């Protein structure tokens, strides 16, 4: 992961932006479609001489910001590991997703920041990425049709449902529609409001051919809306084959402490303890 550029999609699940308190940042944005994502932000750009150059992936812990007044929430997402193709003008022409996985795009909520990315890479352990699951074909009818994403938080020794249990097909933009949108943002997104122009990152890194895209967070359940991460909390985000596992089975794996102690096919998870 350390050599991959990492980007995140803003607003690809109905209701999440409003819950996260970020919708005001995009009130002036014009979209061709009502439910289109709002933009693409960088969360990790290797060797950048700023906070974005800090490797922020840790699959075992979340390190909270040093300022104790900053409030952080987990963001349950799916990430895609993609090959990136360019034309002779170095415009992105194609994204080829090879793997998908559970992802935690933990974010600061109350930081006064010019750019959304400043709320994303807040420590050396502000993101988490699960086991890679191979993609047979990233089209309707492929393996992703059969997967859902669930998330949980353990607080005071009790597991709580964190985000909505959601099929991946509930993403507003998915499959080729999502890939085309990401391609367009990489090529043409301009600096404005809380988003950066992205092409300069690609230019400075000699047009990299591997990237990770976190494709948007699920809406929160009531507990998660009111609870900000505290030291000792345990966060779990799971992408699972819902033809093989019921939601209740996933819950039982946590309650029985069997998620990390046994091998599980067709399942990708992030399990982090908050420090």
Question: Where would I find each of the regions flagged by the language model?
Answer:
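Glycine-rich beta-strand-to-loop/alpha-helix junction loops that act as flexible
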Residues: 9-11, 209-221
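Glycine-enriched loop-and-adjacent helix/strand subsegments that border the catalytic/binding cleft
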Residues: 2-205, 227, 249-275
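Short conserved beta-strand and strand-loop elements enriched in small hydrophobics
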Residues: 149-152, 233-239
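Short glycine/threonine-rich loop-to-helix capping motif typified by GTGT followed
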Residues: 223-230
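Loop/turn positions that initiate beta-strands
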Residues: 208-210, 230-236
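Short, charged beta-turn/beta-strand-edge "cap" motif at the junction between a beta-strand
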Residues: 14, 217-222, 240-245
């Amino acid at each position: 992961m350390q050599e991959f550029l990492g980007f995140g999609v803003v607003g690809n699940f109905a209701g999440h932006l409003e819950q996260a308190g970020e919708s005001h940042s995009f009130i002036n944005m014009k979209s061709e479609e009502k439910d289109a994502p709002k933009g693409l932000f960088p969360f990790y750009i290797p060797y950048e001489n700023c906070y974005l150059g800090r490797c922020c992936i840790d699959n075992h812990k979340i390190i909270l910001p040093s300022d104790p007044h900053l409030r952080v929430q987990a963001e349950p997402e799916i990430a895609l590991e993609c090959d990136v193709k360019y034309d002779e003008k170095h415009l992105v022409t194609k994204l080829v997703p090879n793997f998908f996985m559970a992802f935690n795009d933990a974010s600061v909520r109350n930081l006064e920041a010019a750019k959304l990315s400043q709320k994303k890479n807040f420590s050396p352990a502000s993101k988490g990425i699960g086991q890679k699951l191979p993609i047979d074909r990233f089209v309707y009818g492929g393996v992703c049709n059969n997967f859902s994403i669930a998330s949980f938080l353990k607080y005071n020794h009790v597991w709580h449902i964190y985000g909505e249990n959601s099929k991946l097909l509930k993403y507003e933009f998915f499959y080729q529609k999502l890939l085309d949108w990401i391609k367009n943002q990489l090529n043409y997104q301009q600096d404005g409001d809380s988003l950066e122009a992205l092409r300069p990152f690609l230019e400075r890194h000699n047009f990299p051919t591997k990237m990770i895209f976190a494709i948007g967070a699920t809406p929160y359940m009531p507990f998660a809306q009111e609870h900000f991460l505290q030291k000792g909390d345990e966060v779990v985000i799971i992408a699972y084959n819902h033809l093989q596992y019921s939601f209740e089975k996933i819950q039982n794996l946590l309650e029985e402490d069997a998620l990390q102690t046994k091998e599980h096919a067709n399942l990708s998870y992030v399990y982090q303890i908050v420090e």
